[in-house]
């Protein structure tokens, strides 16, 4: 009731531990934090606000997943799994909701605090916003950003090649 005029919900929070299950410092607590932050919390937030969104015109939910939801990398299996969960949840939610538009942003590596010291070829947050804004205005609900467009094509042509590309990514 406090947010009765809310018409857009953006789920952008995320954490990623760049570790494998074999790393002794990758604890059950870290795993639970990753799942809670990346998957459970957005679902709970949507559930708690769905009636408000349904009652307002031009309502939208924007979930941010990751290119790693499409093709995972060797490290960060739990992160990849949570983002794949957001990907499928967004698609399913789109089927359920007629009055609320459900968008999914599927970005590559973005230059943020979370990715500091990781990877090359990051895109700026502004580039992500610009690409998403175009998609939002055109009601394109599954928004592959920058390199993810190419990753999708490669994965469709040969998932083995996509897997090899991602397996080589260590950051």
Residue ranges and their predicted role:
Residues 2-3, 48-57:
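A short helix-coil junction within the Rossmann-fold of NAD(P)-dependent oxidoreductases
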Residues 9-10:
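Conserved hydrophobic beta-strands of the Rossmann-like cofactor-binding core
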Residues 16-32, 75:
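Conserved mid-core segment of classical short-chain dehydrogenase/reductases
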Residues 46, 82:
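Active-site helix of classical SDR
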Residues 66:
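Residue(s) in the substrate-gating loop at a strand-loop-helix junction
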Residues 71, 92-101:
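Active-site-adjacent segment of SDR/Rossmann-fold oxidoreductases
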Residues 104-105, 116-156:
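C-terminal helical subdomain
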């Amino acid at each position: 009731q406090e947010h009765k005029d809310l018409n857009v919900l953006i789920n952008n929070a995320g954490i990623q531990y760049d570790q494998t299950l074999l790393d002794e410092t990758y604890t059950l607590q870290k795993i639970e934090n990753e799942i809670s932050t990346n998957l459970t919390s957005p679902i709970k937030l949507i559930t708690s606000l769905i009636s408000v969104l349904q009652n307002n015109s031009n309502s939208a939910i924007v979930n941010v997943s990751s290119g790693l939801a499409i093709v995972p990398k060797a490290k960060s299996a739990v992160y990849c799994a949570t983002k794949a969960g957001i990907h499928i949840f967004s698609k399913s939610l789109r089927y359920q909701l007629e009055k609320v538009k459900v968008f999914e942003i599927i970005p590559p590596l973005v230059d943020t605090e979370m990715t500091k010291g990781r990877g090359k070829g990051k895109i700026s947050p502004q580039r992500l916003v610009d690409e998403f804004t175009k998609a939002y205005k055109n009601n394109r609900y599954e928004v592959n950003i920058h390199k993810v467009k190419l990753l999708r094509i490669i994965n469709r042509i040969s998932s083995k090649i996509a897997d090899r590309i991602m397996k080589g990514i260590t950051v």
